[in-house]
Amino acid sequence: MNRVAPLLAGLSLAFAQAPGLTQVAPPNIFAQPSPLPFGAPPFDRIRDEDYQPGFEQGMAIHAAEIARVAANPAPPTFDNVIVAMERSGAMLQRVEAAFDAVKQADTNPARQTIQKAIAPKLTAHNDAIYLDAALFARVKTLWDGRAMLGLSPEQAQLLKIYYQRFVRAGALLSPDDKRKLRDINTQLSVLQTAFQQKLLAGTKAGALVVDDPARLKGLGDGGIAAAAEAAKARGLDGKWVVPLQNTTQQPALASLDDRAVRQQLFEASWTRSVKGDANDTRATIAEIAELRARKAALLGFPTWADYVLADQMAKTPHNAEAFMARLIPATAAEEKREADELDATIKAGGESFTVKPWDWDRYADRVKKARLDFDGDAAKPYFELNAVLEKGVFYAANQLYGVTFKERHDIPVYNPDVRVFEVFDRDGKHLALFYCDYFKRDSKSGGAWKSSFVDPSKLLGETAVIYNVANLPKPAPGQPALISFDDVTTMFHEFGHALHGMFANLTYPSLNNTARDFVEFPSQFNEHWALDPKVLANYAHHYQTGAPIPPALIAKLRRAAKFNQGYALGELVAVAELDMQWHALSASAPRQDADAFEAAALAKTGLDTAHVPPRYRSSYFQHIWSGGYAAGYYGYLWTQMLENDAFAWFTAHGGLTRANGDRFRDLILSRGHTQDYDVMFRAFYGKDPDIEPMLADRGLLPVKP
């Protein structure tokens, strides 16, 4: 997850130098740079009551700095406009980065109250910058005369990004339309915050609660103990709780023996945000979609999707839809084949029902066991979380890029589950700090993500301070964290994002931000190393005996990685299409009934959503309603095409080698947004993206017409 306001990258003046603000007391902890190494947030000293005044002071200082840039009587130059804005807003960036971490990963009622209060103020603050006519006039003067400025390629790219950012924010609108835009932006900030908080509460309230552990048969002793611990954490002694994950399907569905309990758990997930209570999100998302369509129209775009994709790698909704259309025939055919096979398996077992979504994972596992002799639970003893992290994720990065890691116990964290590592570059010098927060808790939003406390910048003399968050099952006290291979993949995925941030070799902090249909490229590419023979041999050892994972089990893991791909791809394509259709609404369209719209949108896909529901339902699709992926979820599929092409290149050139890693780092990971995305990709791959390696990686063949 990237920062809300990309301009907030640095501050050249101390707090006491801001005109009219020298008497503010008491001094806020965010007013000065952190005294900790590398600017790490001092979480041991930050109190909840520091955040709101920190935001208020930070916005005031930033506004004063921007006002000086706009009112500068000197002719505009790259330094006194663009560089000055890059240097501005350090206090606001510090408080925003720290608060973003705790509001997402460790929230509480006080933090939720602050979030509600601050969100519209931040929106108004950013509008005041981007809709400032005098400031834009200086940016536009530079843009119009850019050919005469003698800018370096990186400077020219930054100027282009700033000009486009102002235009996309409404700088060319009339005063009346700017007023309308401000109003829409404020409403959206309030609604997006409301959605996020309703979803968190609804997900917690929607957990499966049972009175008898016998109903959880199939989860195993460890799973049942974890359910008891989850109940205890909620004050439900004597009960057992299976918390909901953020996705439609729930991990426990593969294991639960009782079909009625499986259905109950699935329906708890599917209905978590549509119960007609205070946590129902349907009216909220319909209003968000309507406001986005109105905003797009104000800015001269037919739809929100057209607005969003104008600065993405795909360029237009048509291109994104055409790409997904190429996936649907093979996906739909494989979905049907898989469903038929599951029905046959159910019938062969003497049962009379046909497969439903709550049955799919369980019976897919049976088919997998029968066909591949593979049991995912049998692999878990070889995937102990700490070993996966230090001997797998870190080891792969060392082999590819030469980086090394040392745990830091002196850096304060926002929750006891968090660990911190210092990262050293191939020359032994400091590169970054890396925080990891892997276990699920009720105070944490669902899913997994990467974000940063500090972005690297030569201009500001700063190195990366980055964190990964996930929602892996927390073991009972005293038990090892044995995780599934899917969870292993999640750890490699999120660390791919982290590497992208750590390796950014940029002068200007704004160039750290990349498009949604490019940013998932390094993360999904990094997943491949989880099954690399050399990497796997280093981390996959039995947690008790130390024995390496047997070659036969490795072979089964590899075959299993291509199993059930109709479902895996189908749930992604369905939800990406759902996102695109919500954001293909025009400003003239009436406000939608969320349930009816969703049903119609899914029917249009041509996919078997009755058996293979979308990965997220509209009502709990956090990525698009509060996570920055609106009209961008297709990017997960688009970047699978990119990363499979890249991995095919690696395979053809020797695989896991430092030479290959250094080339990927130089041409992709270090570049940020210093070049157009298609230019960067062609420089590495040698040609435009090709969908065939993606389909081959999933074991799918294109369906011939």
PLM segments and residue spans:
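Bacterial N-terminal signal peptides
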Residues: A5-A16, G20
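C-terminal, non-catalytic "cap/extension" segments appended to globular domains
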Residues: V24-D50, K217-G218, R234, K239-V241, ...
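N-terminal helix-rich structural modules
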Residues: S12, Q23-D221, F650, P705
